[in-house]
Amino acid sequence: MAAPPGEYFSVGSQVSCRTCQEQRLQGEVVAFDYQSKMLALKCPSSSGKPNHADILLINLQYVSEVEIINDRTETPPPLASLNVSKLASKARTEKEEKLSQAYAISAGVSLEGQQLFQTIHKTIKDCKWQEKNIVVMEEVVITPPYQVENCKGKEGSALSHVRKIVEKHFRDVESQKILQRSQAQQPQKEAALSS
């Protein structure tokens, strides 16, 4: 069934809409679904970054006025091709990371151990669980309670690097705790001063 005139928007067209809240939205049509009356507009980035854009999903049932500024009549450009192997690799990596997290939880690893693992994994991808131990680059093993002194391995750059990561992790955790305590005490001080 063909859409009545004015109720169909071609990809690439420039449109302006006024919402029921009197907000004016303007942008390029990137998608339109006639049945659900949903319109996707590409607008300049609200962050102001030059190579970014905002995508707004607009339910046309809540729009009081739509104006087509520039109707695109020619065929829209073809969609960009997707690198399926890259997407599959990314999905596989994400799945492996989630399974690793699930393993750590099921193995009874402490929250501190899980957080340390995530911190190390951000820097060194070659990081895995071996029961409750963290194994980094097949060279360094960190055993519970996961402190610097629990880092074992052949003396060298790998062990030294992992120890530095562990030290920094616990410094950052301690700094965060101090900050949270001071923020928690602030309202108490203000309440005491006001009474």
UniProtKB/Swiss-Prot annotation:
One of its GO terms (cellular component) is cytoplasm. Disulfide bonds: none annotated. InterPro entries: AD (IPR047574), Lsm12-like (IPR039683), LSM12_ABD (IPR019181), LSM12_LSM (IPR048478), Sm (IPR047575). Found in a complex with LSM12, TPCN1 and TPCN2. Interacts with TPCN2. This is Protein LSM12. The modification Phosphothreonine is found at residue 75. It is found in: Cytoplasm. One of its GO terms (molecular function) is RNA binding. It comes from the Eukaryota. Residues 80-174 form the AD domain. Nicotinic acid adenine dinucleotide phosphate (NAADP) binding protein. Confers NAADP sensitivity to the two pore channel complex (TPCs) by acting as TPC accessory protein necessary for NAADP-evoked Ca(2+) release.
